[in-house]
Amino acid sequence: MSLLAAIIRPFWLPGLHSVSGRAVSGLGTWFISKPYQAYHPLQPSTTSSRVDRFILSVADSSLLLHAYASDCSRLGMASFETIHSINRIRGLPRSTAWLLVKYYYASYFAAHAILRMLGVSCSNIDGVQSAVINEVIDVYGMANGFKVPSGTFRCSYDPRNREFVCTRQTSDRGGSHQFLWTTFHEEMRRLSTKILSMSGVRKDQQEVSAKIDELCDVLCSNGNPSGGWLSSVRNKVNYQQDLGAWFPYTGVTKSTADKLFDTRTLWNKDALKIPLTSKSSGDPARFLGTCAFIISLARLMILDMSERHPENKSFHKYGTVAFLNLLDH
C-alpha cells in the first residue's frame, strides 16, 4: 500500500470510489443532459459585465459522480498511453525532444485526473453546453439578464450543499495549460494544509505534506509563482527548440541523453521516493522527475481507489487499471 495514496484518501471526492462499472459519459454530456437545477441568480463579475461564476444545484449526485469517473478514466488512460509511447529515435542518440514533450503531456493529463479524484475539474464549456446551461437557468428564472459564456472553467462539487460551482478562467491566467497548472498548484497547496490539519498529525502525514509542498515549490520554479514551470519548459522545447533537445543538440552528449531516458520508467516507482528539488542535474532532469512524480501520484491514487469499491466493481478496474494491465503484457 502506498503511504502517499493512503494519506490522500480522506480527501477524495465523496462517493467517487463507489462508482461501478464502465464510466463513459463525462461532464460535457452531464451538462447537456440537464440533471440539475438553478437556484442562484447569475451575477456579473466585479471587473466586467460578464458572468464569471455560476452555481448548479444537484439533487441526485450519481450522474455527476459517473461524469467525474468517466473524465478521470479518460485522462488517466491518456497519461499512461502517452508515457508508454516514449521511444528513442534510431540513429539520433542525443535527441530528447519527444521524451520531454511526451512526459509533459503525460503529466498534464495525470494532473487533470488527480484533480478529478479530489473533486475539481478544469473543463472547457463549449457553445452547445453553455446554451443548455443557460436554458436551465432561464427556466428557473435565475438569468438576471445575463448568460453563462463558453470558456474554460474551474468546477467543483460541494456534496454538503449539493452544489456544483463553476468559475471561469480570467484572461490574466494565461491559456488552458497555465489555468490547469495554476489550479493544480492551488489544490496541492490546499491538500498539504488539509493533511496537516487532520487530528493527531503523525510523522507519516508530515512526510506526505512536506513532499506535496516540495512539488508545489518546484512547480513555481524560475519565476513561475502560479505553478506553471512545467509548461514554461515545455514551451522552450516545443516552440523555441531550446535546451538542446533538437538537432544539433547543443550542449547535450549521448551520456546526458542516456540519463534522461533512464527516467522513462520512473513514474512506475513510489512517488515519495522520486526526488524533486535537486537543481544540480539541470532543468531537463528536474523537469522529467517532476513529471514522473505527478504521473506516479495519479497511478497510486487510481490503484488505491480501485481497491476501495464496496463490491469490488470500481470504474477504475474497467478503465485505467485494465489499461495499465494491458500495458504490462
Enumerate the predicted regions with their spans.
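Terminal alpha-helical segments
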Residues: M1-H329
